[in-house]
Curated annotation (Swiss-Prot):
The chain crosses the membrane at residues 24-44, 45-65, 107-127, 145-165, 172-192, 234-254, 277-297. Its EC number is 2.5.1.141. Converts heme B (protoheme IX) to heme O by substitution of the vinyl group on carbon 2 of heme B porphyrin ring with a hydroxyethyl farnesyl side group. It catalyses: heme b + (2E,6E)-farnesyl diphosphate + H2O = Fe(II)-heme o + diphosphate. This is Protoheme IX farnesyltransferase. It comes from Novosphingobium aromaticivorans (strain ATCC 700278 / DSM 12444 / CCUG 56034 / CIP 105152 / NBRC 16084 / F199).
Length: 304
């Protein structure tokens, strides 16, 4: 962990902000907010803001710890070589301390300001990503994304629990939806950046099992994801606005996955089907969870 580029201080606020992986944090904040808004019951706006802020800060802390640990790996990958640590714009101690400060502070404030059950789940999600996934799973098994996907699946559960104070079937389903969504989302990316992973010795699925196996698994997870997203509708946890949206969104997801999963040879097309699936998978999750909130609003207003 000591071969990252030499230090080039001072690091400015943009480097610290980059450590939090703001693009990833956007999705984390959004799904956490959707879990909070879709939950039954009411919550004071200040407490709601505190909950979402803590989710965001906790995710940022976990991301900073991830980059602290993986600085050498990031230096060897084209996609990540310009991050603050491998680019030499920040020292590792600063990144580590920043990550621990964000992580610890977010859990403490969540516990005092929102509730300790939400704080415990937040703490576990940070530990899950920064240790279980980053340190233990990612360098050891091609199933790292499958098992490690739980780290990114907690925000809607935390948002829901911030309102209700307990864990019921619905927040568990929201967790499972993101858990099942993660492999096809990330493996689509891994297919077109697999040479980077191979170069630094990370056993991502395309590197270890090959493209053909990865494509089959992308299709399998996408097919399983579709009925899972409909379960909230079937059990009455969400209404028709969400249900029909989930069905249409899921069918498009499967259709794009079929194009990726059934490809036996890859022509010189820049892996466009894989890139389309990856791009759509991000849009899919935003719209799916957005429609969950829209469904809740329609129910409250008596529109369904």
């Amino acid at each position: 962990m000591d071969s990252a580029k030499p230090l080039a201080l001072p690091a400015d606020w943009r480097d610290f902000f980059a450590l939090t992986k703001p693009r990833v944090m956007t999705l984390v904040i959004f799904t956490g907010l959707c879990g909070l808004l879709a939950a039954p019951g009411t919550i004071h706006p200040v407490i709601a803001f505190t909950a979402i802020l803590c989710i965001a800060v906790g995710a940022g802390g976990a991301a900073a710890l991830n980059q602290w640990w993986e600085a050498d790996i990031d230096a060897g990958m084209k996609r990540t070589a310009q991050r603050p640590l491998p680019a030499g714009r920040m020292d590792r101690t600063s990144a580590r301390d920043f990550g621990f400060a964000l992580a610890g502070g977010s859990v403490f404030v969540m516990g005092l300001g929102v509730g300790w059950l939400a704080a415990v789940i937040l703490a576990f999600s940070i530990f899950y990503y920064s240790w279980i996934y980053t340190v233990w799973l990612k360098p050891r098994t091609p199933q790292n994304i499958v098992i490690g996907g739980g780290a990114g699946a907690f925000p809607p559960m935390i948002g829901w629990v911030a309102v209700t104070g307990d864990i019921t079937l619905m927040p568990v389903l929201l967790f499972l939806i993101i858990f099942m969504w993660t492999p096809p989302h990330f493996w689509a990316l891994a297919l077109f950046v697999q040479t980077d992973y191979a170069k630094v010795g990370i056993p991502m699925m395309p590197v270890v099992a090959g493209e053909r196996s990865t494509r089959k698994q992308i299709l399998a997870y996408s097919i399983l994801l579709l009925p899972l997203t409909l379960v909230p509708w079937w059990i009455g946890g969400a209404g028709a606005v969400y249900g029909w949206s989930a069905l249409v969104l899921g069918l498009v997801f499967v259709a794009l996955s079929v194009k990726v999963g059934l490809r036996r040879s890859v022509p010189n097309d820049g892996m466009l089907p894989e890139k389309r699936l990856f791009g759509y998978s991000v849009l899919y999750l935003f719209v799916l969870f957005g429609m969950l909130v829209g469904d809740r609003l329609a129910t409250v207003q008596g529109w369904q």
